[in-house]
Amino acid sequence: MVIKPVVGSGSSGVQMCRTVDEVAEHTRHLLGGGHMWQARPRILVEEFAQGQYLTADMMGGCLVGIGTGHFGPPPHFVYREYSYPALLSNDESARIADVSLSCLRALGLGWGPANIEFRWTKRGPVVIEVNPRLAGTPDPELIQLAYGVDLVDEHIKLVIGEECDLRARHSRTASARFLAPDRDGMLEVIEGASRAAAIPGVAEVKMYVHPHTPIVRKGDYRDLIGHVIAASPSRDQTAALLQQAVDLVNWTITPFGPKGG
């Protein structure tokens, strides 16, 4: 099962638990002062839905796009890659759209942006979360690259009473790969980011940290140190561009010395 805070974002405090002992341990961590709460401490206990992760981006009750994502190793849920559009059949896309609209109607969320997370299981699409807001970075950037729709601009239009235009201007594949360190320590050097950014088809290479930053992994989005975004007319080409760029970005982390040493 999955234990997570009722209120939060970015996978903070979210953990898969396979045994009763793991459930008890993570619950004690969340409620015993180990988690920074944004609201009154309450936890959710959910069945883990096994299957492809999907996200539906909505605006004013209209489906703009469906993306897919991959995570790092359990028990945490740290994003490693995001892509638009998800590789789905027409029937599968229609089911995601239908369930998304049903969620919005049930919750009274007909206006403005919404981001709905799914797992496609053996039972079909299972709703994980319904978020009444735009998805965080880099989803809006990927949607703009994939479909030519700027969700931030279209949201502003809704706010000021103008009509938004959600029609796709083009059809491309856009993907983001997140850069995650494999150890704790002092980040000494980052190399190759400018060379990666110069590759045609690479839209962005962004580092979240600078050299001489201590790295202490927490099992959530704060573990990530950067991302690379690429887009092209085909899925295979985008994947190749992304890998080429990621291979150029290198960093060095020196493990922390013994405490008190």
Q: Language model features by range: what are they?
A:
Residues 1-2, 8-13, 18-44:
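N-terminal beta-alpha lobe that positions the nucleotide/phosphoryl donor
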Residues 30-35, 39-42, 47-86, 94-127, ...:
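Phosphate-binding core of ATP-grasp and ATP-grasp-like enzymes
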Residues 143-153:
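Gly/Ser/Thr-rich active-site loops/lids in small-molecule metabolic enzymes
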Residues 10-11, 39, 50-52, 62-63, ...:
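A generic structural signal for well-ordered coil/turn residues at beta-strand boundaries
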Residues 18-22, 61, 124, 163, ...:
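Short loop segments at secondary-structure junctions
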Residues 156-261:
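Peripheral (often C-terminal) accessory segments that flank ATP-dependent C-N-forming ligase machineries
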